[in-house]
Amino acid sequence: MTKNNETGWNLDNSYTTLPQSFYTEIPPTPVSSPELVKLNHSLAISLGLTPEELKKEAEIAIFAGNALPEGAHPLAQAYAGHQFGHFNMLGDGRALLIGEQITPSGERFDIQLKGSGPTPYSRRGDGRAALGPMLREYIISEAMYALDIPTTRSLAVVTTGEATYRETKLPGAILTRVASSHIRVGTFQYAAARGSIEDLKSLADYTIKRHYPEIEAHENRYTALLQEVIKRQASLIAKWQLVGFIHGVMNTDNITISGETIDYGPCAFMDNYNQGTVFSSIDTQGRYAYGNQPYMAAWDLARLAESLIPILHEDEEEALKIAQDEISKFSVQYENHWFLGMKKKLGLFSTEEQDQPLIEQLLKMMEKYKADYTNTFRSLTLDAIENTALFESPEYKDWYKLWQSRLKRQEQSKENAYEMMKNNNPSIIPRNHRVEEALEAAVTNDDYSVMEKLLEALSNPYAYSTDQEEYCIPPAPTNRPYRTFCGT
């Protein structure tokens, strides 16, 4: 671990303590003329880094992969994954972990360069990234952070001065991603597929030490590890559902063991409430539709449980039973998180038998009348009537009376209920059309002011500020569905 005192780099790379089959050491591929286009000042400070130093040419070279900070140990991680249900051996095909930054408070965060060049896992890809998708990940990951949803974060984006070729010629870029770690369900699948129980134990022990040290002394720490990951994912997916976030590519290599949201390729936020909403251009069967996300999370976690079977118990039948028992708990945990979150969105402090039907009735009406998900809860929070089909319907008026009656039966005042709603119903989300508007200005016109204004608004989604109102407006009706792409 080496500290550069001027900038604040304080890097280690504990991942190299794992067997070498889990990674390949490889330097980034230099680029011709890097330019810093976005730096996350507040994140830099929390990591113990000095923003003004990071803007200097020598530090920009680090974000571009043209230089390495003291203590860096670049490597590409190996992992596997079920991609749309099909198992593949994978790995970092266009990203490098350069090290782990130890913060002033002693926390450890991966520093990864995304778009840093080809690796042994590139599978004929160029290892590069385009500017638009990297800025998109920056915007949405920071919006998720502001929404209090566990997520990887974005420290910087640099342009490379080189073209990247996808369907068309695009400006190249590199994103510096920050994560609690990049250990995935797919990392455990990779270990299990290779067949070495010792390697699998090494990975599990490393993961426990890094993310769940409180279970190190547990009688069966590998069962406890599975339990903890299930708990975190149940909470995470409920938080996605509560704000209308659709990940789009919930492959097992995109499910983190830390419980953070990762990979913002084809993700988007729902406008009109619909359980079947899909944005990803490659999800033609709706596998990862909004309403399917809890089920797909359970499916992914079952793949983790399968991978752990060799170390859950020496008797395979008993190990299988343990795995099945633990996975069966996910749905109950998820439902509890979701129900509690929905109650908060409606200002309900206590629990009554009719709360679940009250919630379900509202959601059915929202789907029937194609109501905007975020704005419906925003209007309820403000106790305002919108000029929409939902609010003008007789069903809604009847429902509203039931809801108001329910609020009156609480010990807490209506003012307290509305305050809780305000803290749980975001006034704004990164609406797809506003994100596209910001990306178009930045990528096509080299105008980052639109993105900066959007990021400022998204940084406090529960403020209910008049300055944010323009970002509350849904997109104009269109016959063309919004489509997202993975960026690779």
From Swiss-Prot:
Cofactor: Mg(2+); Mn(2+)
Domain of life: Bacteria
This protein's record includes keyword Manganese: yes
Residues at which Mg(2+) binds: 254, 263
Keyword terms: ATP-binding, Magnesium, Manganese, Metal-binding, Nucleotide-binding, Nucleotidyltransferase, Transferase
Active site residues of this protein: 253
Entry EC number(s): 2.7.7.-, 2.7.7.108
Record field: catalytic activity: L-seryl-[protein] + ATP = 3-O-(5'-adenylyl)-L-seryl-[protein] + diphosphate; L-threonyl-[protein] + ATP = 3-O-(5'-adenylyl)-L-threonyl-[protein] + diphosphate; L-tyrosyl-[protein] + ATP = O-(5'-adenylyl)-L-tyrosyl-[protein] + diphosphate; L-histidyl-[protein] + UTP = N(tele)-(5'-uridylyl)-L-histidyl-[protein] + diphosphate
Matches recorded under InterPro entries: SelO (IPR003846)
Alphabetized Pfam families for the sequence: SelO (PF02696)
GO-annotated molecular function: AMPylase activity; ATP binding; magnesium ion binding
Binding site for ATP: 91, 93-94, 114, 126-127, 177, 184, 263
Disulfide bond residue pairs: none
Function: Nucleotidyltransferase involved in the post-translational modification of proteins. It can catalyze the addition of adenosine monophosphate (AMP) or uridine monophosphate (UMP) to a protein, resulting in modifications known as AMPylation and UMPylation.
Family from the record: Belongs to the SELO family.
NCBIfam families: PRK00029.1 (NF000658)
The protein's name in its UniProt record: Protein nucleotidyltransferase YdiU
Record organism: Bacillus cereus (strain G9842)
